[in-house]
From Swiss-Prot:
Job of this protein: Cleaves the 2'-5' phosphodiester linkage at the branch point of lariat intron pre-mRNAs after splicing and converts them into linear molecules that are subsequently degraded. It thereby facilitates ribonucleotide turnover.
A Pfam family reported for this protein in Swiss-Prot or TrEMBL: DBR1
PANTHER family: LARIAT DEBRANCHING ENZYME (PTHR12849:SF0), RNA LARIAT DEBRANCHING ENZYME (PTHR12849)
Coiled coil feature spans: none
Region (Disordered): 242-275, 501-534
UniProt: a divalent metal cation 1 binding residues: C8, H10, H228
Any single GO CC term annotated in Swiss-Prot or TrEMBL for this entry: nucleus
Family: Belongs to the lariat debranching enzyme family.
Subcellular location: Nucleus
Annotated binding of a divalent metal cation 2, by residue: D39, N84, H174, H226
Protein name, per record: Lariat debranching enzyme
Organism: Drosophila melanogaster
Keyword Zinc: yes
EC number, as in UniProt: 3.1.4.-
Length: 534
């Protein structure tokens, strides 16, 4: 399989696909798959654009909206991860991945998929130590703080990826793993980027959690971006590290009891697919999409035969990991800790590499692992004809939305959507799945909602709403409910009673006796009115 790898896309999809077309023409070959290492910028409209963490002067719609609207179609299956310049609201709708446009697939906060037998894993975002131990507490509309923290890597995704067993052919990240420059031409890198020297000396260049993942997962290829330069490295692995040294260097390393549990799971787990050993990881970072920049690389990876278009499938082991770690999701802003090495007696499971039984349970839920092509447009796309002057327009951030793809995926697997959890944790109503508008944040009576949907004419006043809820159709003419003829009831009575007005000369039909409460209200009202007239 021939795979094109892109560094930072920065929304330039048309240019990237044109470059691939040029490579195909010159080389007389066919590119089967495009992988993008973040800063994808899947902005559908101006509202999405407001959630990108960049200075206002750099906000640009670019060309993704054309693929979202259907004006253009991605000519090659495209898989991407998130970076630090994204339409964060849209990506947050798809925490476990999904289609952002036809033939363009997002891996989620972290994910593992298979394309014709090529196993691809990835993690979105960049590392910031002050947010790493927090939950996914952000939701739109974002504050100045949360519009940045929303794309910061969290410990849960790293923890989940460490549970993977067997081979991983390709790993995608936006950040670089810490220390990766020691395995390549460091001197040449410093000539290109001399200001990297200070961060190298302080150990701040790159992501420590990604370094741990590199040692734990040991993929054949690792592709990254973010630092806007091309850099290659070869990282040798001692295979005893995979369940040893890599774990001891991790913040969630195992105790002796956990090691025993891991040995049991290893014996119970199915044998991973046969593959050649991976003595080294081939690391490659690429630049952003600009002229005369090294932003695209084509690699050839062994795969199953491709008949027609490549086949995108869920990874059964990853599904089982998501299911078994669902209880570890946090949507709180405070720090929390995952199962691992700790003082005292070991009481909690910390190894979630799936057993045979867990894999069987997942495959029973997903009888076909092929990812369904269930993309839906849930918001209007950008219209350049009507919004050409958008850089001078004032646009609010979008309201929070739920995506039908995530709803289907979570329901099938039996897990929670983190976006739903954070809304509920903050006392907000869940918006309709796929709707363009968020529901009222005020709690409404379900009966009232049903009446509002059934009534042909709009209900204008609160009185009319209560009338429809509390009484059958009136048998007499509607009463005059002007301000001077209405009295205020106590709040508790107002929820159940009807605001009554004086009708002194009309007798109730014998067949429909008036309720005692209504008579009492009429007498009390009449006394009040008479007192006022006197």
């Amino acid at each position: 399989m021939k795979i094109a790898v892109e560094g930072c896309a920065h929304g330039e999809l048309e240019r990237i696909y044109d470059t691939i077309e040029g490579i195909e023409k010159v080389g007389g070959t066919k590119i089967d798959l495009l992988l993008c290492c973040g800063d994808f910028q899947s902005t559908r409209n101006l509202e999405d654009l407001q959630t990108m963490a960049v200075p206002k002067k750099y906000l640009d719609m670019c060309s993704f909206y054309k693929y979202y609207s259907g004006e253009l179609v991605a000519p090659v299956l495209t898989i991407f991860i998130g970076g630090n310049h994204e339409a964060s609201n849209y990506l947050q709708e798809l925490p476990y991945g999904g289609w952002v446009a036809p033939n363009i697939y997002y891996l989620g906060y972290a994910g593992v998929v298979n394309v014709n037998g090529v196993r691809i894993a990835g993690i979105s975002g960049i590392f910031k130590g002050h947010d790493f131990l927090r939950g996914h507490h952000e939701f739109p509309p974002y504050t100045d703080s949360t519009c940045r923290s929303v794309y910061h890597v969290r410990q849960l995704e790293v923890f989940r990826l460490k549970q993977i067993s067997g081979r991983v052919d390709i790993f995608l990240s936006h950040d670089w793993p810490t220390g990766i420059y020691e395995y390549g031409n460091k001197a040449q890198l410093l000539r290109k980027k001399p200001f990297f020297a200070a961060d190298m000396e302080s150990g701040k260049l790159g992501s420590q959690p990604l370094e741990e993942l590199l040692k734990a997962v040991q993929p054949a290829y690792w592709f990254a971006a973010h630092l806007h330069c091309k850099f290659a490295a070869l990282v040798p692995h001692n295979h005893s590290q995979k369940l040893g040294d890599a774990e001891s260097s991790s913040s969630s390393s195992s105790s002796e009891d956990e090691d025993e549990e891991r040995e049991k799971v290893k014996k119970a787990a199915p044998v991973p697919p046969p593959s050649k050993s991976v003595p080294v990881t081939k690391f490659l970072a690429l630049d952003k999409c600009l002229p005369r920049r090294a932003f695209l690389q084509v690699v050839e990876v062994p795969s199953d035969p491709i008949e027609g278009t490549p086949r995108l499938e869920y990874d059964a082991e990853w599904l089982a990991i998501l299911h078994s770690t669902n209880h570890l999701i946090s949507v709180k802003e405070n720090y929390y800790y995952l199962p691992g090495k700790k003082a005292g007696e070991f009481t909690e499971r910390s190894n979630f590499t799936p057993t045979e039984e867990e894999l069987e349970a997942v495959t029973a839920k997903f009888q076909k692992l092929q990812v369904p092509e269930n993309f839906e447009r849930t918001v209007p796309a950008f219209d350049p004809a009507e919004q050409s002057d958008y850089k001078h327009m004032f646009v609010d951030q979008p309201k929070v939305q739920l995506n039908p793809q995530s709803n289907t995926f979570c329901a099938t697997l039996g897990i929670d959507d983190p976006l739903c959890l954070v809304l509920l944790a903050n006392g907000l109503d869940l918006p309709a799945v796929g709707a363009t508008e968020c529901k009222d944040r005020e709690t409404k009576s379900s009966k009232l909602q049903a009446v509002e949907e059934d009534v042909a004419e709009p209900l204008v006043t609160p009185t009319k709403r209560k009338l429809n809820l509390s009484l059958p159709a009136p048998t007499t003419a509607a009463a005059d409910t002007t301000d001077e003829n209405v009295i205020d009831l106590p709040e508790e009575e107002a929820e159940e009673a009807i605001i009554a007005t004086e009708t002194p000369h009309v007798e109730e039909p014998a067949s429909v006796p008036a309720s005692p409460n209504v008579k009492k209200l009429k007498r009390r009202n009449q006394n009040i009115y008479q007192a006022q007239e006197d």
